[in-house]
Amino acid sequence: MSIHLGAKGEDIAPRVLLPGDPLRARFVAERFFHNAYCYNEVRGMLGFTGTYKGVRVSVQGTGMGLPSHSIYVTELFQDYGVQKAIRVGTAGGLQEEVALKSVVCALGAATDSAINARRFSGMHFAPTASWSLLRTAVSVADEMGTGVQVGNVISSDVFYDESGSWRLWARYGVLAVEMETAELYTLAAKFRREALSILTISDHLVTGAVTSAQERERSFTQMIEIALEAIIQ
């Protein structure tokens, strides 16, 4: 057991999907896993393990934002020996060509958070995806006929941002805004693990378009299928 996860060491698989929403973790387990069981209910942050196409895979909710994500990812890497982690979540589109409901694989992640500034004593670290996972996910998506867009995202500390700072990030070609990827990639680098963030565009800051609950579920399912196929390779 770790401080925030009530699992025994063998309860968590070496491959883990990371939705922010613990209810999405349950959805993944019920929809895609065979013989799924719940290994964590601490703080309501549900975690499940099962098999997908004969391979053991876990799914663990992480909450919203870099600090919460950091806690769970650190414990998964440090205390449970997780080797591959794929974040699956939603993001806001920052480019017109990144359509609503499309899937984005985050190549790199900028951030307005002070976490890395503190961690690296004011110096700047470039958090990037694991090439092997990224390449596999893109290949899987192409084979599925889905296709993904690959590029940088911005991991922000602020959800209700009235400053309009997203326009600056958009000017530099950043595809989407979300709240966790920069920390996932930084921790993967620290622990020498593989990590990738696969995101569904649920709303669009440029066009103002938003998805319905039903549309989010369908597009989320597509993203999960890509993530599962990639992580078992």
UniProtKB/Swiss-Prot annotation:
It catalyses: a purine D-ribonucleoside + phosphate = a purine nucleobase + alpha-D-ribose 1-phosphate; a purine 2'-deoxy-D-ribonucleoside + phosphate = a purine nucleobase + 2-deoxy-alpha-D-ribose 1-phosphate. The record marks R216 as: Important for catalytic activity. The keyword Glycosyltransferase applies. A purine D-ribonucleoside binds at H4, E162, E178, M179, E180, S202, D203. One of its GO terms (biological process) is purine nucleoside catabolic process. One of its GO terms (molecular function) is purine-nucleoside phosphorylase activity. The active site is at D203. It is an enzyme of class 2 (transferase). InterPro entries: DeoD-type, Nucleoside_phosphorylase_CS, Nucleoside_phosphorylase_d, Nucleoside_phosphorylase_sf. Keywords: Glycosyltransferase, Transferase. Pfam families: PNP_UDP_1 (PF01048). Phosphate binds at G20, R24, R43, R87, V88, G89, T90. One of its GO terms (cellular component) is cytosol. It comes from the Bacteria. Gene3D superfamilies: Nucleoside phosphorylase domain. Belongs to the PNP/UDP phosphorylase family. Homohexamer; trimer of homodimers. PANTHER family: FI09636P-RELATED (PTHR43691:SF11), URIDINE PHOSPHORYLASE (PTHR43691). Catalyzes the reversible phosphorolytic breakdown of the N-glycosidic bond in the beta-(deoxy)ribonucleoside molecules, with the formation of the corresponding free purine bases and pentose-1-phosphate. This is Purine nucleoside phosphorylase DeoD-type. The gene is deoD.
